[in-house]
From Swiss-Prot:
Gene: paaK
Family to which the UniProt record says this protein belongs: Belongs to the phenylacetyl-CoA ligase family.
A Pfam family reported for this protein in Swiss-Prot or TrEMBL: AMP-binding
Record protein name field: Phenylacetate-coenzyme A ligase
Catalytic activity: 2-phenylacetate + ATP + CoA = phenylacetyl-CoA + AMP + diphosphate
SUPFAM superfamilies recorded: Acetyl-CoA synthetase-like
Length: 437
């Protein structure tokens, strides 16, 4: 049963009604992109397809995919489908290599985005009565402003904290008594540690009721850790700058069974990450999105590199996405074995003495790749003897070996030894190219 505030009619429309709207909007998007973005005209022509070839949803697979490299190759503004005078805001991705991915928004795009994030917050149980602490970074990154304008559109009171200043953030959470927090899960763990320090222990009695977490993958075990230590319901919000920003999909409070994709604005597909072959709902693969209402920067079959599967709707008509299991481009191949950081995190957080703060380092020793895992002890476990620490190391090595089939070096360090992130956590250091240079 839906328990939160009034839903948008499309959230509970019939599947036929939703698909009719998607078909109508896809026809517009394909035509808009083809007529206004030279890159798309070239790609469609090279593939021998035209927007008129799209008549039903299954026809979308005839059209070529778009990649991050396509957007970078047309840096900065050649992918914009409207004149610059209609672009009211520019964001850029936080990529660490190459040129950033530039995203433009018309006023219509901004309004749609605010409405989508407001809908997401309603799905999380938010209302105009709430105070919402936004700890996503503000600036070119879409997280802070996307969350901010959505919370304002909801009618809530926004606390625009941004990232960083952890001690001050924790103090203001105590002083301002917010009901909801929007933040990356890794930075939330930093805030929890600081709250516990300031409170002299347990932080689960603070005012926060719900946390909306996104911008990086996180495991079910990390969710439970956050919920236990902060006394909240932790929900998953999904988004990416190239498609819109936060709010592409949102987990619903009444089911907490995977983010519902707002399919009236974003059309999802799953493909084989190796050859792009379309996969059926329920099969694991790479997630693609086509925007349905984006004016300034429409994207057609955009390859997110996120690995997941599509699931039937539960609380709403629209389909859900399973929790992201990893990224096809972040996957580590070590001695021919595919390893995802999320797999290792699942094992780490099962240990009662280990915290969720860890780093992975991949090196090359001669001609052989090696994986090292550095993980912090919980503060409550600092009294472990050397022998007990060695035993935990041995157990974690054994768990990882059983799971992925390769041996690892495990180092346990005291709490606070691993640098804390104020945004997305940087957990993987692949030094193979550096060593071989």
């Amino acid at each position: 049963m839906i328990t939160n505030t009034k839903l948008d009619p499309i959230e509970t429309a019939s599947v036929d009604e939703l698909q009719a709207l998607q078909t109508q909007r896809l026809k517009w998007t394909l035509k808009h992109a083809y007529e206004n973005v030279p890159m798309y005209r070239r790609k469609f022509d090279a593939a021998g397809v035209h927007p008129d070839d799209f008549r039903e949803l299954s026809d979308l697979r005839k059209f070529p995919c778009t990649t991050k490299q396509d957007l970078r190759d047309n840096y900065p503004f050649d992918t914009f489908a409207v004149p610059m005078e209609q672009v009211v805001r520019i964001h850029a991705s936080s990529g660490t290599t190459g040129k950033p991915t530039v995203v433009g928004y018309t006023q219509n795009d901004i309004d749609n985005w605010a409405n989508i994030v407001a809908r997401s917050l309603r799905a999380a149980g938010g209302s105009p009565k709430d105070k919402i602490h936004v700890a996503y970074g503000y600036g070119l990154f879409t997280g802070g402003l996307g969350a901010h304008y959505g919370a304002e559109r909801l009618g809530a009171t926004v606390i625009p904290m941004s990232g960083g200043q952890t001690e001050k953030q924790a103090q203001l959470i105590r002083d301002f008594q917010p009901d909801m927090i929007m933040v990356t899960p890794s930075y939330c763990l930093n805030l929890i540690e600081e709250l516990e320090r300031q409170l002299g222990g347990d932080a689960s009695g603070c005012s926060l009721r719900v946390g909306v977490f996104g911008a990086e993958p996180w495991t079910q075990a990390m969710r439970k850790e956050i919920e236990r230590r902060l006394g909240i319901t932790a929900l998953d919000i999904y988004g990416l700058s190239e498609v819109m920003g936060p709010g592409v999909a949102m987990e619903c409070l009444e089911t907490t069974d995977g983010p519902t994709i707002w399919e009236d604005h974003f059309y999802p597909e799953i493909v084989n990450p190796h050859d792009g072959t379309p996969l059926a709902d329920g099969e694991h693969g790479e997630l693609l999105f086509t925007t349905l209402t984006k004016e300034a920067l429409p994207v057609i079959r955009y390859r997110t590199r996120d690995l997941t599967r599509l699931l039937p709707g539960t609380a709403r008509t629209m389909r859900r996405m399973d929790r992201i299991s990893g990224r096809s481009d972040d996957m580590l191949i070590i001695r021919g074995v595919n390893v995802f950081p999320s797999q290792l995190e699942e094992e780490i957080v099962k240990f009662e003495h280990l915290s969720p703060h860890y780093q992975l380092e991949v090196n090359r020793r001669g001609h052989l790749d090696s994986l090292s895992v550095k993980v912090e002890l919980k503060e409550s476990s600092l009294t472990l003897t050397h022998e007990q620490r060695c035993q935990v190391c041995h157990q974690l090595r054994h768990r990882i070996k059983s799971m992925v089939g390769i041996s690892t070096d495990v180092m346990i360090v005291n709490c606070g030894s691993i640098p804390r992130s104020e945004g997305k956590a940087c957990r993987v250091f692949d030094l193979r190219n550096i060593v071989g240079a």
